[in-house]
């Protein structure tokens, strides 16, 4: 840390009125690119319009203008998010049974969608309890609203209106900061100031505000709800905020005010800031006093972090200095030159952010069931399954996006002359070693993981169960995973003396928690079946990484195409006369990576769905006997491929296949339709461009004969457009099929 003199004067970081607001210009399709602004001559124009509308690099080379467009677009994105949130809250206010769910969350199912009676569609309005007919929703909003202390549909209505106001504000900000007062490039590149503001402001004050809301509003309201008080009798948020005596009735330490804080007797506040661990037995969710404590702690951490970076005052860290000091004995120049990359290539910045956010999203999906954060979430199995699946898919897409933007950075923004012998350069120089080793790992994992299943199927088919890998024959126990589970289960006694339970019941070491005779969470046993499927996870993830990393490391050049950088991020082949050079662009690696990402996530969500139904979810009798939904069949059945097909896919598809004529029939139609969308994708993926061009020319000839030929000349999709349409339908069809399969099943049996 170095001390230096403060900056002499305040720099003006904003340019006034840089771009005219012109509705005439915006009304012209393709106004952002010269070749598109001319209008269509062939049908390829509409595809290029969509491909390039947000590719700001292709509109201009001016980094400042690109930065402003991205910044402005972020406000537009936030506005859309606010509108979406407003819609969610409005449905809760206008079309839902939230208040009756709040009165009886164990018997009433959440619904916030009522289908209009058009051609018999009202069949979809199932009986969700409490005298309400509607579609059961699985987004978890009801549980979130209860946790935040919302007790009436009027409050939801007000929040919905507030979100629309914020959306308007965001749209205005997006326009204002591009057309009226646009930041200069130096402002976007001032990373220390940005780190301080984002860490202290967004994360620090944001967490502090949420902790404050939890302490003053959510905790007392939830305490009263848990005690069975009628929501209409509970004080309103403003009454709790303004009247300390009301709070002191639930949490006595409020009567002492801030004296314990300033006299450092912080333990006085332990009635509303707890460290209990485990789940609240009434709601099956985390103790809200634990989560309030957590957010307060997070706020303190980030408020400190937001004062760490050196700006006008000459003290604190410099990101550039930290990166350049980051050298080791085997790493050459270390991270020298990385700072310049991250302040001039937004693709490089985005790649890192997407990889991090994608990984965090996947971690969130695991925490949603292992540490259910909201009341009555854990016993709403359909919502649990939906939240896990949703966050897994999102995480997968974000990670593929990270590889896409990393490759775009390498093609468009990487300057080899400024990156000599730093870590990035060294990775690119020994890319052959990395990729060939990774390839070997993939082959090893693939043959061995799949081989274990094939062995089991063969032994099963030959009637030799004693020679199978299973918990009752040849055991392959996941001993490391079991050791980790055990360590966490024993932790409260040794590492956290004040905690009464572990971080999650899933680790084991305690009894299950049941709410109204339904299992919220129980210790999750791991055995041979989990060992087998975990190695399939390892295999699919490593193949995904192989494809994506090869795309990034060979994006600029390869032995096959040394001048790949000149061909750009996406190109079909290396020109005429060079056979065997098709489908080698960085874009094609992203395309292939998407399929393996889909494989990876599918195996994960199938594993989760079956494992939870078999070993966790179920009902508890008055005598304490637990009966799981599929009766614990995972350990024996999932050790063969045949078991996955017969006892998971086929057995659990019965609900969606037999859903016709019931309130779940929409899932039956979706199951059918999404299979069709998926199959439609194969038409784009298996046939070549020339086939379609010939067909089109024949059809155009017929139109000319009848003198009804269009002015815009029809063209077959380019190779890349065809593959893009193909992978889109493949993923959408596959995901919607899985969605219908999961929900029809779990809504029926959960």
Swiss-Prot record:
Topology within the bilayer: Multi-pass membrane protein
Chain sites annotated for binding chlorophyll a: 683, 691
Enzyme Commission number(s) of this protein: 1.97.1.12
Residues annotated as binding chlorophyll a': 675
PROSITE patterns for this protein: PHOTOSYSTEM_I_PSAAB
The keyword Chloroplast is annotated on this UniProt entry: yes
Binding residues for phylloquinone: 692
Major localisation: plastid
Signal peptide (from-to): none
UniProt cross-references to Pfam families, sorted A to Z: PsaA_PsaB
Free-text cofactor note: P700 is a chlorophyll a/chlorophyll a' dimer, A0 is one or more chlorophyll a, A1 is one or both phylloquinones and FX is a shared 4Fe-4S iron-sulfur center.
Any one GO molecular-function label of the UniProt entry: electron transfer activity
Protein's cellular compartments: Plastid, Chloroplast thylakoid membrane
Keywords annotated in UniProt: 4Fe-4S, Chlorophyll, Chloroplast, Chromophore, Electron transport, Iron, Iron-sulfur, Magnesium, Membrane, Metal-binding, Oxidoreductase, Photosynthesis, Photosystem I, Plastid, Thylakoid, Transmembrane, Transmembrane helix, Transport
GO CC, one annotated term: photosystem I
Biological function: PsaA and PsaB bind P700, the primary electron donor of photosystem I (PSI), as well as the electron acceptors A0, A1 and FX. PSI is a plastocyanin-ferredoxin oxidoreductase, converting photonic excitation into a charge separation, which transfers an electron from the donor P700 chlorophyll pair to the spectroscopically characterized acceptors A0, A1, FX, FA and FB in turn. Oxidized P700 is reduced on the lumenal side of the thylakoid membrane by plastocyanin.
Family classification: Belongs to the PsaA/PsaB family.
Subunit description: The PsaA/B heterodimer binds the P700 chlorophyll special pair and subsequent electron acceptors. PSI consists of a core antenna complex that captures photons, and an electron transfer chain that converts photonic excitation into a charge separation. The eukaryotic PSI reaction center is composed of at least 11 subunits.
The protein's name in its UniProt record: Photosystem I P700 chlorophyll a apoprotein A1
Biological classification of the source: Eukaryota, Viridiplantae, Streptophyta, Embryophyta, Tracheophyta
Gene name tied to this protein: psaA
